[in-house]
């Protein structure tokens, strides 16, 4: 995907080959090996880190970044949540009630849907918001964590119920919502992720209104796209007290322009060099800029060999 330093064919002696490499700047150097055996192709790769603790984001942070999102959330909160909850009796356990829920986000009729799991025993509980990776799918809810004594809310981001048959979501992924992460990315307020980020924050509003929530401990977690949303939510809502971001996506979009790995969805690698407006807009949706606003403890993970959410971008 990114600049190749050396590419060559080799013939192994005694089944071994030793390679040497170095870097002059902080980053990750990857070795990818392809072997052709008969009519099959085998691939393997290994990635080495060079002073990764010295990596700094390339993306620029708009001067009004935080102010912009504070105002957008204030505007969204003028729309009442109007929550709806339906008990899913077939999913309930001896200790947990499971609900299909929805609530309004940024305008009348625009809803987030999810699966809420609440311990049956009377009391006040901590809460965990689970935000999704990229794609369109149904959700079962995090019953396991609820059985350990926490409220859990697992949300979808596309404004559709999350308890339909898989074929329903497949049709959307292959049709109207195909490539949704690119929609209106040159429009600051109509970019697809605007509603998504606001929706994740309204999910926190929803949790905080639950009578069973203890008002003290509220976490958010997810992987890839969900890792990004975890950082974004924790950065913008002070009621979030901790987060866990698993290989977060949407990081350091501008890195591509400096020939450095950027995060999924690799806007400028796959979809062409940006015009001035697009570059301006995506800075407001860059996980790296949200991370600058974090003030609560978090747990991160990433994979050196990950070429979807490269570690350089995190």
Language-model-detected regions and their locations in the chain:
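Alpha/beta-hydrolase fold nucleophile elbow
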Residues: 213-223
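N-terminal cap/lid segment of alpha/beta-hydrolase-fold proteins
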Residues: 6, 75-122
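Short beta-strand-to-loop junctions in surface cap/lid or active-site-entrance loops
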Residues: 106, 113-124, 132-137, 143-146
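Low-complexity, Pro/Ser/Thr- and charge-rich linker/hinge segments at domain boundaries
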Residues: 50-84
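The feature captures the conserved acid-bearing segment of alpha/beta-hydrolase catalytic domains
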Residues: 258-314
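Cap/lid segment of the alpha/beta-hydrolase catalytic domain
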Residues: 137-198, 255-262
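Hydrolase active-site cap/lid region
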Residues: 227-275
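Beta-strand-enriched, solvent-exposed domains that form extended recognition/catalytic surfaces
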Residues: 1-56
């Amino acid at each position: 995907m990114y600049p190749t330093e050396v590419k060559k064919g080799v013939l192994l002696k005694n089944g071994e080959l030793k390679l040497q490499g170095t870097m002059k700047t902080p980053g990750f150097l990857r070795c990818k090996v392809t072997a052709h055996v008969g009519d099959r192709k085998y691939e393997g790769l290994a990635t080495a880190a060079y002073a990764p603790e010295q990596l700094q984001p390339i993306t620029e942070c708009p001067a009004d970044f935080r102010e912009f999102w504070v105002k957008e959330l204030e505007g969204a909160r003028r729309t009442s949540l109007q929550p709806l909850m339906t008990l899913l009796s077939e999913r309930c356990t001896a200790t947990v009630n499971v609900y299909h829920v929805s609530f309004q986000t940024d305008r009348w009729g625009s809803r987030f849907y999810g699966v809420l799991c609440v311990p049956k025993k009377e009391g006040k509980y901590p809460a965990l918001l689970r935000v999704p990776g990229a794609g369109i799918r149904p959700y079962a809810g995090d019953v396991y964590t609820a059985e350990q004594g926490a409220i859990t809310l697992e949300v979808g981001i596309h404004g559709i119920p999350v308890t339909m048959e898989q074929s329903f979501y497949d049709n959307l992924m292959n049709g109207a919502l195909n490539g949704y992460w690119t929609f209106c990315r040159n429009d600051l307020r109509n970019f697809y992720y605007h509603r998504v980020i606001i929706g994740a924050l309204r999910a926190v509003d929803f949790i905080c209104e639950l009578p069973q929530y203890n008002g003290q401990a509220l976490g958010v977690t997810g992987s890839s796209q969900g890792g990004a949303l975890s950082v974004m939510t924790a950065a913008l809502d002070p009621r979030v007290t901790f987060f866990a971001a698993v290989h977060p996506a949407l990081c350091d979009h501008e890195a591509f322009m400096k020939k450095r790995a950027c995060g999924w969805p690799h806007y400028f690698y796959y979809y062409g060099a940006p015009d001035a407006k697009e570059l301006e807009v995506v800075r407001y949706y860059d996980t790296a800029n949200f991370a600058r606003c974090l003030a609560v403890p978090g747990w991160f993970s990433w994979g050196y060999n990950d070429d979807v959410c490269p570690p350089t971008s995190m």
